[in-house]
Amino acid sequence: MRITIPKSAFNPVFVPYLTDSTHRYLILYGGAGSGKSVFAVQRFLYRLLTLPLCNILVVRAVAATNRDSTYALFRQVIFRWGLSELFSCKDSDLRISCANGNSVIFKGLDDTEKLKSITFPKGELTDIWIEEASEVQEEDFNQLDVRLRGKGTHKQIVLTFNPVSVLHWLKLRFFDRKDPRAVVLKSTYKDNNFLDEDYKATLEGYKETDPYYYS
């Protein structure tokens, strides 16, 4: 499927990771407005359109939060890029299907039984996106990690989250230990070319009072 998406559609800091298929773990973290979640969706849409097999499981700690966050963001980028004719979005059970047979399913870790019965019309699970990964327990991450298996296609987990405590399992696992299968990218609002000046000024105001939003 040949679709042309201009490089200007992406923030430059993320472009080197658009086609990464060598790492198992892609870690995207940063403060508010950094564009990490938008890039995750842009990247997944690119993979859905260009790879012969790409089936994505999008996960949050609570299933109900997907509708107004991850699922809505997928729909927004599909519309913005003019791809509505190539994707079918099923609001009732939060499923997105690409014209080539690839698809996306949205689930939550608050119902692990439903995670056990996930199937895709075309092939196997190839990608997992864990949004707000700091809200997920390490045990739940491990369960997702071991599910992503199989020969023939590269498997990858993308984790997006804001800066975390020095004691959080994400820091211990991906920052304190150096896993050669993981690539880590920190971004800030300064890397996001699509923010308006008023919002940038708002974030600047948190520099001294709340580094969580600023960093």
What are these regions (language model features)?
Residues 1-215:
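Phosphate/NTP-binding elements of NTP-utilizing enzymes
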